[in-house]
Amino acid sequence: RVFLTEDAQKKLNRDNQSLNLFKSVNVFYKSRKELDNLCGRDEIAHQGLVAEVEQLEEITLKEFIKNNKKQNINLIALEEVTDPRNIGSIIRSAVAFNIDGLIVKERSFPSKSRLLYKSASGGIEHIKIFKVSNLNTSLKFLKTKEFWVSAFDVTAKKDFTKNNWKGKNI
């Protein structure tokens, strides 16, 4: 379902006259105050439009590896990244680079954060999130499945976009 203010509807129609943006979506009109209440005003700014989405299906890292027959699999592992905005930005970038999944520590991943979803700009719907209890153990497991583990550093001399990411990589 999509909730929006009448002002937001007018702006969307004005900016996208040739598109019928909500043709197959249930749209409910609400006041700005009602949208504030839906979002938790202190937590996130809604800009006049709020979408209610279903919870994403979760799969374990082991299930993903077992069922995935692709020759090239690229994953990202995050450690000590806890800010929802930063994680959302990483998710957005990962989707742009066709990354297959994100491995995060279960206890430090802000899965209920609305800021995470907003920062990801819809990207969270296009990537698998693997919540693990121990990142080190998960990386060791992936190495037994022929994954290469690389790390990024701000002082690195090599541009990661120039690397050949064929095969199985983290």
Annotate each language-model stretch with its function.
Residues R1-K69:
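N-terminal positively charged helical leader segments and presequences
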Residues R1-S24, N68-F160:
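RNA substrate-binding interface of SAM-dependent RNA methyltransferases
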Residues S31, T60, A156-N164:
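Short, solvent-exposed coil/turn linker segments
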Residues L38, S119, N163:
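Residues that scaffold the ATP/ADP-binding catalytic core of kinase and kinase-like folds
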Residues H46-G48, I73, I124, G167:
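Short, solvent-exposed beta-strand edge segments and adjacent coil->beta transition regions
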Residues N164-I170:
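A contiguous loop/helix-start segment that scaffolds small-molecule binding in enzyme catalytic cores
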